[in-house]
């Protein structure tokens, strides 16, 4: 009975996210999405003179300097853009001191980005990862793929609770054969991933979306508190009223931001 109730609650949660994200994506965010990522799935076509209303970011300053007139780069659109939503489902994302956990925040972002991409006519894919890739849905068009992505973000259990952002980047390097737009959703509590993430960003358009909980930025001085790492299982009692302990916690928090 509890399992049935849990499934029903999960489906209601997916439905609420779908309704909210559809509204935001169609009424508020779709124009910003199209404007922000125009060019991510485009091929260069030719140069032409700047006209009022053209986007300034497409101005080619080298050609402008040579011609003494303002020129922009004109693009021709590829058949479609592949959008990959990458979500960290490691143990640390189950934490949340407010109404929603970081995992549930990730589901909200997945819904918003997924439906925005769908309304823009783009394909949407999903990669869930922890220590390694846990689930990969290849890019496809249609709302059903977005709804499934939301459901998987909320329900998929990691094979290992630890985090390896580098393993996710390496998987994408091998799996994506064409330039894609990648939304990378994580709390980025990991070490030594900067090089592989930077290499991925050289081949694709990567947008990092950081999941941050207020308690991870500032812990109140409330005396002795037992902390447990949800990924390693290590636990320790810390006196949060101790100034040295507060300094150490603040330093650790800044390390991951």
Locate each region found by the language model.
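Short beta-strand-loop
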Residues: 123-152
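Short glycine-/polar-rich loops that comprise or flank the Walker A/P-loop
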Residues: 80-81, 121-122, 179-180, 202-205
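A short, flexible beta-alpha/helix-coil linker loop
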Residues: 90-94, 131-134, 243-245
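Von Willebrand factor
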Residues: 145-180, 192, 213
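DG-centered beta-turn motif at the end of beta-strands
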Residues: 61, 87-90, 126, 172, ...
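Von Willebrand factor type A / integrin I
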Residues: 1-36, 42, 46, 54-55, ...
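Acidic, polar low-complexity linker/tail segments
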Residues: 12-85, 89-97
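…and closely analogous acidic/polar surface helices at protein-protein or active-site interfaces
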Residues: 76, 93-123
